[in-house]
């Protein structure tokens, strides 16, 4: 198979949703249909046959939430599928936003009883800004929920995107009978008594008159709704879907796996192949460019706690990866050898010899890489556009509970901060270590992982909310620091102030009008 044919097989997408909408469940069902698992909840590596969990971190298992992005791969219907399962909790939005830079499409999962919720709305806005195609799966049809027509209206009114249903529910909750699949000309029957999953339409495009469904009042209602939508609703347009202007909507129940395989088949038919990415000087790097290029969108420590390792996740943008190849690390200008490289099935992994544009690979990292790094070969010498960063608002002082374990404490901080889920600052005057986060859960996960993974108990003292502003090195003066504006350095050694509030920042500006305060550090 040629490089072009291999690249065209790739379908790389993320699943986004509000917590508890069923994101992890649908991920596991997709993996089941892809042959990667034998039952929901257990994920199997392709070569080893060992089973693992897609929510692999202990704290995720205990709380039932995803707080890291898992990358999983399988083959289905002639396509190579890469799924990125993103954190649903809002405190981990930074990790999710970066992950969305590495995909070509998004699947938005919505709880039929709750409709569009806060986190879904936030994530959709990111996807929309990037112009990523969105496919919608309305979940939990086996439970009582909102009217399907109301849910479609909400997509347009709240998210501002036109929608087109690809199938339609026949009843809901305890009356759920199946899906009227007008896209494929059939009815998908929920828990059929005769074991037949599909009722195919006859030559007139209808359910055969002799079939019991024709006398079912829920089916009659579904027919009326569908006819109304087909006449008055939006028409399906592959062009508009790929442009991110129209979302195809599928209904189903991830828990019972109903409607999921039909969704997968249709999604793979219309989801886009790998797309180009822009460099910092606006040059579009096409997937078929023969030179290898990629960017690191995530670094994850301790995917295997036995080895205390760290993996840098790379989205391949162009060309082909070959094991042992030398690449340029653009940030440092140095060459690095990519010899120990893996692909993933949750925390299971296997060595990879080759990968192409659209694939996600994991590079073992001993401290060489940073989130946002660009790797290239040949004539490609520019970095890709920077990944989004979030300025934290909540802060804590942190120290080791046992001073004798300072080494493991420092290693834990270094590795967890490297992942980018929490920010590190050091007081310029006292040397105190301070952590910044978008939300409280990040601190809880940090504390938990320090204990579990690094055997280092920590003392964390809340500092409340702060406003971060960077300054230029030449403006740095220790005398400016006070309890209301703490002078510190970030993990890259850039100077900054942590202001107690807006009033403290205004007071500082009045006193030091020549000092430029920056929301982001700029060289």
Curated annotation (Swiss-Prot):
One of its GO terms (molecular function) is GTP binding. PROSITE patterns: G_TR_1 (PS00301), G_TR_2 (PS51722). The keyword GTP-binding applies. It is found in: Cytoplasm. Keywords: Cytoplasm, GTP-binding, Nucleotide-binding, Protein biosynthesis. Gene3D superfamilies: P-loop containing nucleotide triphosphate hydrolases (3.40.50.300), Peptide chain release factor 3, domain III (3.30.70.3280), Translation factors (2.40.30.10). The keyword Ligase does not apply. Belongs to the TRAFAC class translation factor GTPase superfamily. Classic translation factor GTPase family. PrfC subfamily. This is Peptide chain release factor 3. It comes from Lactococcus lactis subsp. lactis (strain IL1403) (Streptococcus lactis).
